[in-house]
Amino acid sequence: MLQIIPGLEVNPTARAAIEIAAALGAAGARALVACAGGRMEGELQAKGGVFVPFPSRTKSPLAMALNVRRLARLIAAENADIVHVRSRALAWVAYGATRLTKTPFVTTFPSGYQGSNPTALRYNSGLARGDAVLADSNFTAALIAKLHFPAAGKIRVVHQGVDRQVFTPDAVAPARVQAARRHWKVAPHERIVLLAARTRPGSGHKILIEAAGLLSRSGLAGVKFILACDRDEDSALERGIDRAIAAEGLQGIMCRTGPCDMPAALLAASIVVVPATEARAFGDAAVQAQAMGTPVIAANLGAAPETVLAPPMVEESSRTGFLVPPGDAAALALAIATVLSLGATASGKLSSRAKKHVETCFSAEHMCAATLEAYADVRRGGER
């Protein structure tokens, strides 16, 4: 079994590839991962995967054409039964190589690749050419079927999995939580509202800033708002966030910081907010926070209703978090105030339901089992 990904840097794509490699190894299969390498090579090999160096980051047409032949030779040399790819450029390379070798071809279609013009749609369509097309949510599956209709009959929903050995309260030492609070300069009596997201349009930073301003003016005290952002993104967006914080007069209660120890940050938080204004197919932060038992408030768009259960989609007794209209700072402020006012019993029940929801629907084990089932069906010819 051969997976091909851009690299083994620390990101959800590499994490998923490693989890699948481990599951394949446990099932007695040889799990190859071809890519440009990265910091997670050691973890891949420790979990039974085999790293195969491959120039997978190139996107130039000539280099991609050369990679088709290179990948076909690798497939033949390793006698790979199935090829699984997770990016657009690599999808075209793998499509060409697997047609040459007559090898089954599986793709995972990331949700962000919607395409806004014919050229983009054509480029993205490589991911829709798999013998099985894996979508990370029902939202993504519907989007693929709409934009790439020929793929509709080959789509399977395989939700991303959370590593519950990492994202569980028992795995986080109290010292890690205290270190996060010290880094953010949070006083012992203060509670934390955390937004952990990339600094990019659509992440909703300014919606939270506006909501925090409303809460501050209404007299809310004893709360610190933390924006944990990647610092390697658009600096103009970062400056815009800083200006918005200053305009609301929130410098004393809102802190923008860089990447953090995410499990510790989620456990330190009293609330995790995901106020996105653009639809995302799978919200890592929302699911990871629920795994930690931390209350989540998310914008009700994209796949949020799949990952965060809230009325009217479920009964109040089945709630695992809160959904608010996207772009509505007043609704977000009200939800934050509501969660902060929950008593210990209500908060404990919400936390237990959220953790159970993740265990049932979004575990790495669940993701791996569904993916291996897709491999088995494709190998039997069930998807071809």
Q: How should each PLM-predicted stretch be described?
A:
Residues 99, 105-135, 142:
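A conserved, positively charged/aromatic
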Residues 309-329, 339-344:
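Conserved acidic donor-binding segment of nucleotide-sugar-dependent glycosyltransferases
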Residues 267-281, 294:
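Acidic donor-binding loop of glycosyltransferase active sites
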Residues 130-157, 162-166:
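A short, active-site helix/loop in glycosyltransferases that binds the activated sugar's phosphate group
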Residues 238-258:
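Nucleotide-activated donor-binding/catalytic signature segment of Leloir-type glycosyltransferases, i.e.
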Residues 11-22, 191, 200-214, 330:
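A conserved mid-protein helix/loop that constitutes part of the nucleotide-sugar donor-binding site
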Residues 295-298, 305-308, 315:
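Short hydrophobic beta-strand element within catalytic cores of glycosyltransferases
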Residues 85-91, 109:
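Short His-centered aromatic/hydrophobic patch
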